[in-house]
Structure formats: C-alpha cells, structure tokens
C-alpha cells in the first residue's frame, strides 16, 4: 500500500510503500550493516552474493559506523544498478532521530541519481520495529525543497521499504507524515522573503488550517488597541504593515489547553538600534521562526487528529525604522499593566511575547505554556546550534522536553533562571527595562523578563536562536529554513503524561 506524502506545496513528494516481501529488483538496493559486523536481510540473498558483500566489507574496511555509506559493485545475482551498504552503529541503541538521519543520508546519496526506484530492506532489525517508517521520515525531511522562486529538477524517488511488521510501520508513517506537514509549513513560512511574509500574509496562511478543523482567530490593530496589547502595538507601529495577533486552536480534547506562544517578527531591522548590514540583517526574515514552529505544530496535531487541546498564540509584527517607530528610551505599557523602559529596540521579541503570554493566560487558562523564539545572540554564544536553550522551573518539563529532543535530534539544554538576572532588569523610571547588563548572560536575562508574564502554571521558554536557518545541508534539513521545534513539540505533546 503506497502512502502519499503530506508535503506542503513547496516540497517535492517522494513515494513510499511498505511490504514484507524479499524482492531485490530495483534501480538501487539498500542494505544495513551494524558495528558488530551484522548485515541485515542477508537471508534474502544467494550465498554467493552474501560472500561478495562480506568481501566488499572487508576490502573497504567498512566498520558499520552509524552514517557510513558504502556503494559496492552489484553482484551478478541482483537485478539492480547499484547497491548501498549503510552503517547503523549499535542497532540496540538507535533513537528515532538517528534513524531519521540515516534516511536523510540515503536521500542525499541518491539526490543526483537519475533512476527512480529504491528498494530498502530493513527486515531483521528486531530492536527497531519502526525502523522502516522512521527511515522514510528522514528521507522525506531531507527531500524538502522550497520552490516558490526556483524550479526543482529533482527526480521523484519511489521507495519500496521491506519491513517485518507492515501494519505497525504504515500506521506510524502516517503520523510521521502529519508531523512532516507541520515541519514543511514552518519551513515554507520561514523561507519566504519578508516582502512576501508579513503579519497579514502569515495570518492568511494560518487561516488555511481551518479546513483541518483548527479554529483560527486574527486580532487586527483595532483589537490590539482595544485589549491594551501595548507591547505588541509599540513594536509594530514603525511599519506600514500593522501588527496582528494570530490564534490557532486545535480542540482535540476537553482537557485544559496547552498553550504554545511563538515570536512572530516577520522582519527585524533592529529598529533604531539597527542591525549591522550584511548577513546578519539578511537573515532577519527568519525572526518569525518561533511563530512558524508553533503553527506547524498545530497543523501536525490537527492532521493526525491528536487527542490534545492545543492553542498557538502568535504575536506578529515588523520591527522597522520610521517616524512612527518605537525609539530607545520610550516607556511602553504591556497588556499585563507592567511598564517597560525600552533601552534597546532590537530587544523587541520579548516585548511581543510578553503580550502573547498574557493573552494565552487570560483567554485560555492553560495547564502549561511553552514559548518558542529566536530570541538572543547570547544563547548562540552559549550553546551554538547543537542545543536550543531551555529555561523553566518545572522539573517535569525539563525531563519531558529533554527526552523528546533527544528522541528526534532537536536537543535542548537547560540554562539558568536566577533572581540575579531579574535584578538586572530594574529600571529607575518604569517597572522594568527590556535589557540586562551589557556583557551579562543575555539569554537568561531575557528569560527572566518573560517569566514576569508567564503566570503560575508550568512554563518553559525555548530560545531557538541559531536554529531557524542553516547555511549548509544537514542530515534531515537541506540548506534554508529548518522548521526546528515542530518535531520536538509534536513528540512532547504525544508522549505519555505530556500535560503533567
């Protein structure tokens, strides 16, 4: 049974089918080899072919290390144009994310191959019953392309994956494709130029989720003024394009909702604290990646009809320079009533999140709030791009989000929330200021700012600065927008006791 990929319009769909056959006929045959010298699915091959494979492994010093790929001469008994032997390391310890990466490596290896059919044999991997479906997930994630302004000449591949448990892999793959749809939405939104993706156009993309049963509400500038969302209004007032507050609600259960709040700065010039020209400002179309992530997560849950009550709050604005723009030294009033002295107009993300957090608390009474934002360069200095920064006082959230991140390869690392960083936010003329001390731990100071608005329920802040875009291909992400966080949050939402 072939399962079509639920890709966004800008992604090139691969075709997948799962079966339990031992067929070897294909343009490309893929086999797997572990670090303990086990080649899986060998029983399907003639003895002479097995001998040739073992000889190729020995001659090429192929260790079976995870991610290692060896292309070997095609044995005469196999009707294929190429055979790939893929190392999986220790099969007993593979995480889903590591299997995804193997799939991405295969997709990359076959990117320029003109032949379409690929036969993948995963039978015998008893410690990874979902290996086939997770492998397909990685292939699909890597095969995404943003083609709005550039045509793709990729050859669509037809992957035929042999598995031990057909029903289990088909069902799991269907759920993974829902997650892919969310990832691809987030990538599409983040890849789009800021001239095309601004608060109103983002809201229009969110409205498309109504067809999936998502309740979408868009607060216009007049609504923002009426509700006293003063921080969001202040950040957006320098642009000709007014700010919005976008809400996407998937009512998949009657439990108290989980709220995701995503920073949605569709272009960040820095305001009057303007960013340096060059690569830094050119990347600032991606400052809405947090909003893209939480909207993509809602889409993923809606497609698989997940039994979770999930609401995404996305404060959207452009941070621009004009005669109407916020200027350094301004004092603004947030929806919560706290006044903020704006000492740096380029520390605007925490301002829109403050009103977003307040709106989530006041209107949905959530059991948990997680905000997602490309917030601080300080986080990149501390952790680089291997880990996202996790800030929370909730030990269950630390454990759950850390585990979910390890499972899918979107890892998080806990950073400190400390009163000392809150003390840095004291202002002589307002309740607080929007920056800490120069040269201090900026990511922690920003998190302490957000904590003022997060409420008493469990809350976590994910600083994904450095993760929104990648300049080079990685295992499951082609160069461009990553959709980082959709897989992490989707796994967290669907794992047991995620709402505790």
Curated annotation (Swiss-Prot):
Keyword Cytoplasm: yes
GO cellular component labels: cytoplasm
Residues binding Mn(2+) 1: 268, 346, 348
Record-level GO BP terms: proteolysis
Positions of the catalytic residues: 275, 350
UniProt xrefs under InterPro entries: Leucine_aapep/pepB (IPR011356), Macro_dom-like (IPR043472), Peptidase_M17_C (IPR000819), Peptidase_M17_leu_NH2_pept (IPR023042), Peptidase_M17_N (IPR008283)
This protein's UniProt keywords: Aminopeptidase, Cytoplasm, Hydrolase, Manganese, Metal-binding, Protease
Cofactor(s) needed for function: Mn(2+)
Subcellular location, principal: cytoplasm
Record flagged with keyword Manganese: yes
PROSITE patterns: CYTOSOL_AP (PS00631)
Family: Belongs to the peptidase M17 family.
UniProt-recorded name of the protein: Probable cytosol aminopeptidase 1
Organism encoding this protein: Shewanella oneidensis (strain ATCC 700550 / JCM 31522 / CIP 106686 / LMG 19005 / NCIMB 14063 / MR-1)
């Amino acid at each position: 049974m072939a399962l079509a990929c639920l890709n966004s319009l800008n992604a090139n769909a691969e075709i997948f089918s799962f079966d339990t056959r031992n067929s070897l006929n294909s343009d490309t045959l893929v086999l797997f080899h572990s670090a303990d010298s086990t080649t899986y699915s060998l029983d399907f091959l003639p003895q002479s072919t097995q001998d040739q494979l073992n000889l190729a492994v020995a001659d090429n010093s192929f260790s079976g290390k995870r991610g290692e790929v060896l292309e070997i001469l095609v044995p005469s008994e196999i009707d294929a144009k190429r055979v790939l032997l893929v190392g999986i390391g220790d099969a007993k310890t593979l995480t889903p994310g590591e299997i995804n990466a193997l799939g991405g490596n295969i997709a990359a290896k076959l990117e320029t191959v003109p032949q379409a059919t690929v036969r993948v044999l995963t039978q015998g991997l008893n410690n990874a019953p979902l290996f086939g479906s997770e492998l397909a997930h990685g292939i699909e994630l890597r095969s995404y392309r943003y083609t709005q302004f550039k045509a793709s000449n990729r050859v669509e591949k037809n992957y035929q994956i042999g598995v031990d448990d057909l029903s289990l892999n088909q069902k799991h793959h269907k759920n993974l494709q829902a997650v892919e749809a969310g990832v691809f939405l987030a990538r599409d939104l983040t890849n789009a130029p800021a001239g095309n993706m601004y608060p109103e156009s983002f809201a229009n993309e969110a409205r498309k989720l109504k067809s999936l049963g998502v309740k979408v509400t868009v607060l216009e500038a007049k609504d923002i003024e009426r509700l006293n969302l003063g921080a969001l209004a202040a950040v957006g007032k320098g642009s000709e394009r007014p700010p919005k507050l976008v809400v996407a609600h998937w009512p998949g259960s009657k439990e108290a909702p989980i709220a995701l709040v995503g920073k949605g700065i569709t272009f960040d010039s820095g305001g009057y604290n303007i960013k340096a020209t060059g690569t830094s400002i050119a990347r600032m179309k991606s400052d809405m990646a947090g909003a893209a992530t939480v909207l993509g997560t809602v889409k993923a849950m809606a497609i698989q009809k997940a039994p979770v009550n999930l609401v995404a709050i996305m404060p959207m604005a452009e941070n621009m320079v004009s005669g109407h723009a916020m200027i350094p030294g301004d004092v603004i009033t947030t929806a919560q009533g706290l006044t903020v002295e704006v000492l740096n107009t380029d520390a605007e993300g925490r301002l829109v999140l403050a009103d977003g957090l307040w709106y989530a608390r006041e209107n949905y009474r959530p059991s948990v709030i997680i905000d997602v934002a490309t917030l601080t360069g300080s986080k990149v200095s501390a952790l680089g791009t291997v880990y996202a920064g996790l800030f929370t006082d909730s030990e269950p959230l630390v454990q759950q989000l850390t585990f979910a991140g390890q499972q899918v390869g979107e890892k998080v690392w806990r950073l400190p929330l400390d009163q000392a960083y809150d003390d840095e936010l004291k202002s002589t003329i307002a309740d607080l200021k929007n920056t800490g001390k120069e040269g201090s731990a900026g990511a922690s100071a920003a998190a302490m700012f957000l904590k003022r608005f997060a409420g008493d329920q469990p809350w976590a802040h994910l600083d994904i600065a450095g993760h929104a875009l990648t300049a080079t291909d990685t295992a499951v992400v082609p160069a461009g927008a990553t959709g980082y966080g959709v897989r992490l949050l989707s796994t967290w939402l669907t794992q047991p006791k995620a709402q505790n």
